[in-house]
């Protein structure tokens, strides 16, 4: 039967007690990790958010407390009053391992059924079970460590931005749907039947309005929502650290955020980030790494060998070059002895990225093996080896096709090889980079129009503005992403604040004046009243915590996440609502066949 506290007050957390507290009387409260009955003594490991403390009950200490302690089971919630003493058998593996509490009084605050999951670190349990019983999963010490990291990170960010003159301001959760990119989550309006709010994909438009309003420096740590197909490490609702600044250029935003990154990683994870952070253009990132978020912790860079093979009589290479494509390669060190079956699997791998196949050259000490040797000849093979500065033991992997296919497939193959060779196993390095000079626009062949790579309010680079209408694909953006170990940590841009330039941008994107005003009229109207030059950046806060806490699963850093199907096993959301609620909203549900 559950007991009440009856005025009993906790004096200290379990994990805080040390030798300096010996001789003091304390009250601790928490959950029973385990219990051992050794005849005349009962030992209870008591756990709270700060750690585990051993409590000993004995007939000679207090018989009533001893008998009650013998009734407890794992995950019972209890309160214990007693005196802290030195342990006879210390456990140096525990922070509290030199002391124990002599239990003189115990209250069983609530009982527990046998938990469906073990409350321990490094739990190897099916994810569906963990999510269904998330409140138990969150009791585990390793999970609690993660959320302490999350809390500390948010505090460091808030303190830093406050010290740098930022105001924390909130923007609406119920806003206007402006579909461009991912699908919106829609919220029906009862007051306006047939009309809908949208949950924000980002606070983009409102933070720009705050700059028009003269708030100069804004930030918030806020929820954002995207109704998109969930890939690994994506969630339908996620947290963003969002900021916007007035009267700045790209260098100002980057300089401030480098200091923020340095402070966060030092204070939270004791990682020294050297400034300035390396910069790499979008073109260089794609040409060398086949990715706009390159992992710089290892080499194996992509090399263009088109010139080296342009004269060889090999149809695959010739066709690619004649059609405006290229022939490129990566070299995998110490892989020349890789078996044919393994290489064939790599060939199948690149085909998933639309490559037609994978050519290869194994540069061994006593021979050079390659299925294309008969086409390239000794001279052609040597040209490839020289152009790559290949060494004995290297395996050269080659793709020929249009540039987009070559770069994407070799970029993915580079990461796959690092994984197979365990190049990054136990690698604790943090390699940051700014990626800059992104294309402002990309051409959507299906819709036969240009679309914004970031959003329609991104400022073109000054020297490229003249090409916006005549050659839109050539225009680069004043956009910048901060990349860490092959993942995008955040991204931002300088915004357009010139209404005439914004109109040109909408025109290039295929918006009529009417459709632009229908979607973004409130922002365009505001821009009639002296908007300042402004720009900003947003971090994926959940992804940042993954790095700081050392976990590879985004669900580990969100208290109550959805599963891969955007479903919550704990609350069983989304769920059916009753007809009355739907009727009030003027909504009818069409059942899918």
From Swiss-Prot:
What SUPFAM superfamilies does the record point to?
Class II aaRS and biotin synthetases, GAD domain-like, Nucleic acid-binding proteins
Q: How does it assemble?
A: Homodimer.
Question: Which sites bind L-aspartate?
Answer: 180, 226, 454, 495
Instruction: Spell out the protein name for this chain.
Output: Aspartate--tRNA ligase
Q: Show the catalytic activity.
A: tRNA(Asp) + L-aspartate + ATP = L-aspartyl-tRNA(Asp) + AMP + diphosphate
Report the locations given in the UniProt record. Cytoplasm
GO cellular component terms? cytoplasm
Task: Name the InterPro entries for this protein.
Answer: Aa-tRNA-synt_II, aa-tRNA-synth_II, aa-tRNA-synth_II/BPL/LPL, Asp-tRNA-ligase_1, Asp-tRNA-ligase_1_N, Asp/Asn-tRNA-synth_IIb, AspRS_core, GAD-like_sf
Q: Where is this region: Aspartate?
A: 204-207
Question: What protein family is recorded?
Answer: Belongs to the class-II aminoacyl-tRNA synthetase family. Type 1 subfamily.
Whichever gene encodes this chain, its name is: aspS
Pfam families cross-referenced by the UniProt entry: GAD, tRNA-synt_2, tRNA_anti-codon
Using the record for this protein, list the coiled-coil segments as residue ranges, or answer none: none
Role: Catalyzes the attachment of L-aspartate to tRNA(Asp) in a two-step reaction: L-aspartate is first activated by ATP to form Asp-AMP and then transferred to the acceptor end of tRNA(Asp).
Print the keywords alphabetically.
Answer: Aminoacyl-tRNA synthetase, ATP-binding, Cytoplasm, Ligase, Nucleotide-binding, Protein biosynthesis
């Amino acid at each position: 039967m559950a007991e009440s506290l009856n005025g009993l007050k906790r004096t200290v957390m379990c994990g805080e007690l040390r030798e300096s507290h010996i001789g003091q009387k304390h009250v601790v409260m928490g959950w029973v990790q385990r219990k051992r009955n050794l005849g005349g003594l009962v030992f209870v490991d008591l756990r709270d958010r700060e750690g585990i403390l051993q409590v000993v009950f004995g007939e000679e200490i207090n018989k009533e407390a001893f008998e009650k302690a013998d009734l407890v089971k794992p995950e019972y919630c209890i309160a214990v009053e007693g005196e802290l003493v030195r342990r006879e058998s210390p456990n140096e593996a525990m922070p509290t391992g030199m002391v124990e509490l002599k239990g003189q009084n115990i209250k069983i605050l609530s009982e527990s059924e046998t938990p469906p999951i073990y409350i321990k670190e490094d739990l190897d349990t099916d994810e569906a079970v963990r999510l269904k019983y998330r409140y138990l999963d969150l009791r585990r010490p390793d999970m609690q460590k993660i959320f302490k990291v999350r809390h500390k990170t948010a505090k460091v960010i808030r303190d830093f931005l406050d010290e740098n003159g930022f105001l924390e301001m909130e923007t609406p959760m119920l806003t206007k749907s402006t579909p461009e990119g991912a699908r919106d989550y829609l919220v029906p309006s009862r007051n306006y039947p047939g009309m809908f709010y949208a949950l924000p994909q980002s606070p983009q438009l409102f933070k720009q309005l705050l700059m028009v309003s003269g708030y100069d420096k804004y930030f918030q740590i806020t929820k954002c929502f995207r109704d998109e197909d969930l890939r690994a490490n994506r969630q339908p609702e996620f947290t963003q650290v969002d900021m916007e600044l007035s009267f700045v250029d790209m260098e100002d935003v980057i300089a401030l955020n480098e200091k923020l990154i340095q402070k966060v990683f030092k204070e939270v994870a004791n990682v020294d980030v050297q400034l300035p952070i390396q910069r790499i253009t979008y073109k260089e990132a794609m040409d060398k790494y086949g990715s706009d978020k390159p992992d710089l912790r290892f080499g194996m860079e992509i090399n263009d060998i088109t010139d080296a093979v342009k004269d060889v009589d090999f149809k695959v290479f010739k066709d690619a070059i004649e059609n405006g494509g290229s022939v490129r390669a990566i070299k995998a060190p110490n892989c020349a002895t890789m078996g044919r079956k393994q290489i064939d699997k790599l060939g199948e791998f690149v085909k998933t990225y639309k490559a037609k196949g994978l050519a290869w050259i194994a540069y061994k000490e006593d021979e050079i093996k390659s299925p294309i040797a008969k086409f390239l000849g000794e001279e052609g093979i040597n040209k490839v080896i020289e152009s790559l500065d290949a060494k004995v033991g290297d395996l050269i992997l080659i793709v020929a096709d249009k540039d987009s296919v070559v770069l994407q497939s070799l970029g993915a193959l580079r990461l796959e090889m690092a994984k197979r060779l365990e190049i990054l196993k136990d690698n604790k390095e943090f390699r940051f980079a700014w990626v800059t000079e992104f294309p402002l626009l990309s051409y959507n062949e299906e819709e036969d129009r240009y679309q914004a790579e970031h959003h329609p309010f991104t400022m073109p680079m000054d020297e490229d503005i003249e090409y916006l209408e005549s050659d839109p694909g050539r225009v680069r953006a004043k956009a910048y992403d901060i990349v860490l170990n092959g993942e995008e940590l955040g991204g931002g841009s300088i915004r357009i604040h010139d209404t005439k330039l914004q109109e040109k941008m909408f025109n290039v994107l295929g918006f009529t004046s009417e459709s632009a005003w229908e979607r973004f009229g409130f922002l365009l109207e505001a821009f009639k009243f002296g908007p300042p030059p402004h720009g900003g950046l947003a971090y994926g806060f959940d992804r940042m915590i993954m790095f700081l806490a050392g976990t590879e699963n985004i669900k580990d850093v969100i208290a109550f996440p959805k599963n891969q199907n955007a479903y919550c096993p704990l609350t069983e959301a989304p769920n059916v609502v009753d007809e009355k609620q739907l009727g009030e909203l003027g909504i009818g549900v069409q059942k899918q066949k």
